[in-house]
């Protein structure tokens, strides 16, 4: 099968064109038409319905789904591939909701920054799908691929997809997809190539310094790294001989907690507990510049303002226009590989860290729980991390 490059696909999507995305022959082994919602043209839905002939769905990020109160279609998902359908929707200004124009209206409303859940009738004729946060590095499906492509074009994380069917009603595969591509002059890529593209875009890492660092917890070696995807530096402290399997804490910088000992969070206490553990048992702490789960210090303070008005730590980030957690651990995985570490005993309560590291080739040999005392100021925060973010506390 003749495939195009990911860069060619991104250029086509930015022009408002649909492309073909094929998945693994050992998975669904299908081709989907994909368009980015923000860039799509007025004929996109009609083209998909006329020539694709499959179910037109609208992959979106989890943040959009939460913002619009789009709940799962079913309580217990038994789909063999775990596709995360939400309840179907029509925009409230549609009539029947099924026409190409009205499904286009509904799709565009999903990415309207002013839209709320009350702007949609449920059920409807457009089927949102929730993509996993780390895209094809977590799940190699068309849902994640289309949202990854949207992000890579600089658009909001939303797309339209539609399976391509043959004239006889069976799913188009192989030669049929190639013929479809030629007939309609479309770009065609694979999810496998998209996954490789994302992994190959990992930043350049440079080790700049190494010093001895005595602390109240013990003596450490401190390393300084720079990357080409951040203006902020990364610090690593290590104790003992570094082995292929290592005790590791990946800690996101928290000025308020780590430096000013804020009681709004548990970050400072987790850092202290990690340093004590590494001082006693050996290992490494990677200190990443990911303030406020990636939204930055000022936005974190704005989130605190919303929390004082009754929001929780997740809904506050979403209200500011962010996903609940923007962090990615590519740089952490690179640093571990720099030290020859490919397997870790991870000091963490956050399952997303496990998933992200494993997607970058770091094996999680064991989880070391990191439980610290709560207080009257951070109890709601801790409850939200457990109930909404799945933290193991």
UniProtKB/Swiss-Prot annotation:
Pfam families per UniProt: DHBP_synthase, GTP_cyclohydro2
Residues that hold Zn(2+) according to the record: 254, 265, 267
Residues annotated for Mg(2+) 2 binding in this entry: 28, 142
Keyword check for RNA-binding: no
Cofactor section: Mg(2+); Mn(2+); Zn(2+)
Functional pathway: Cofactor biosynthesis; riboflavin biosynthesis; 2-hydroxy-3-oxobutyl phosphate from D-ribulose 5-phosphate: step 1/1; Cofactor biosynthesis; riboflavin biosynthesis; 5-amino-6-(D-ribitylamino)uracil from GTP: step 1/4
Reactions this protein catalyses: D-ribulose 5-phosphate = (2S)-2-hydroxy-3-oxobutyl phosphate + formate + H(+); GTP + 4 H2O = 2,5-diamino-6-hydroxy-4-(5-phosphoribosylamino)-pyrimidine + formate + 2 phosphate + 3 H(+)
Gene Ontology terms for molecular function: 3,4-dihydroxy-2-butanone-4-phosphate synthase activity; GTP binding; GTP cyclohydrolase II activity; magnesium ion binding; manganese ion binding; zinc ion binding
Annotated CDD domains: GTP_cyclohydro2
Record site: Essential for DHBP synthase activity: 125, 163
GO CC annotation, single: cytosol
Chloroplast listed as a keyword: no
Gene Ontology process terms (BP): riboflavin biosynthetic process
Residues that coordinate or bind D-ribulose 5-phosphate: 27-28, 32, 139-143, 163
Leader sequence residues: none
Residue numbers binding Mg(2+) 1: 28
Region (GTP cyclohydrolase II): 201-393
Region (DHBP synthase): 1-200
Keyword tags: GTP-binding, Hydrolase, Lyase, Magnesium, Manganese, Metal-binding, Multifunctional enzyme, Nucleotide-binding, Riboflavin biosynthesis, Zinc
Matching InterPro entries: DHBP_synth_RibB-like_a/b_dom, DHBP_synthase_RibB, GTP_cyclohydro_II, RibA, RibA-like_sf, Riboflavin_synth_RibBA
Active-site feature positions: 325 (proton acceptor), 327 (nucleophile)
Cofactor note: Binds 2 divalent metal cations per subunit. Magnesium or manganese. Binds 1 zinc ion per subunit.
EC id: 4.1.99.12, 3.5.4.25
Family under the similarity heading: In the N-terminal section; belongs to the DHBP synthase family. In the C-terminal section; belongs to the GTP cyclohydrolase II family.
Protein name: Riboflavin biosynthesis protein RibBA
Lineage of the species this protein comes from: Bacteria, Bacillati, Bacillota, Bacilli, Bacillales
């Amino acid at each position: 099968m003749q495939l195009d490059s990911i860069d060619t696909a991104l250029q086509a999507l930015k022009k408002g064109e649909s492309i073909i995305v094929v998945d693994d022959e050992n998975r669904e082994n299908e081709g989907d038409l994909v368009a980015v919602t923000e860039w799509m043209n007025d004929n996109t839905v009609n083209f998909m319905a006329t020539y694709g002939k499959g179910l037109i769905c609208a992959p979106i990020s989890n943040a959009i789904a939460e913002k619009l109160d789009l709940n799962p279609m079913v309580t217990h998902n038994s789909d063999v591939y775990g596709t995360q359908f939400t309840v179907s929707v029509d925009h409230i200004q549609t009539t029947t909701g099924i026409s190409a124009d009205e499904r286009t209206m509904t799709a565009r409303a999903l990415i309207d920054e002013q839209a709320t859940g009350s702007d949609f009738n449920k059920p409807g004729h457009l089927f949102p799908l929730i993509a996993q946060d780390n895209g094809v590095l977590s799940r190699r499906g068309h849902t994640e691929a289309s949202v990854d492509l949207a992000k890579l074009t600089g658009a909001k994380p939303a797309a339209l997809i539609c399976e391509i069917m043959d004239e006889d009603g069976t799913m188009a595969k192989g030669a049929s997809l190639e013929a479809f591509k030629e007939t309609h002059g479309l770009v065609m890529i694979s999810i496998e190539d998209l996954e490789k593209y994302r992994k190959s875009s990992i930043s350049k890492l440079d080790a700049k310094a190494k010093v001895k660092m005595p602390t109240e917890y013990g003596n450490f070696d401190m390393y300084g790294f720079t990357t080409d995807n951040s203006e902020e530096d990364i610090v690593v402290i290590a104790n003992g001989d570094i082995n292929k399997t290592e005790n590791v804490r990946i800690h996101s910088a928290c000025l308020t907690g780590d430096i000013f000992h804020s009681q709004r969070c548990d970050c400072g206490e987790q850092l202290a507990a990690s340093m004590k553990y590494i001082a006693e048992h050996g290992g490494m702490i990677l200190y990443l510049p990911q303030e406020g789960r990636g939204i930055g210090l000022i936005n974190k303070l704005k989130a605190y303002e919303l929390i004082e008005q009754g929001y929780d730590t997740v809904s506050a980030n979403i209200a500011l226009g962010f996903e609940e957690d923007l962090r990615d651990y590519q740089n952490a995985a690179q640093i571990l590989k720099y030290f020859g570490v490919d397997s870790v005993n991870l000091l963490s309560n956050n399952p997303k860290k496990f998933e992200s590291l494993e997607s970058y080739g770091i094996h999680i040999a064991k989880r070391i729980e990191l439980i610290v005392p709560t207080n009257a100021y951070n109890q709601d925060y801790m409850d939200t991390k457990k109930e909404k973010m799945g933290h193991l506390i």
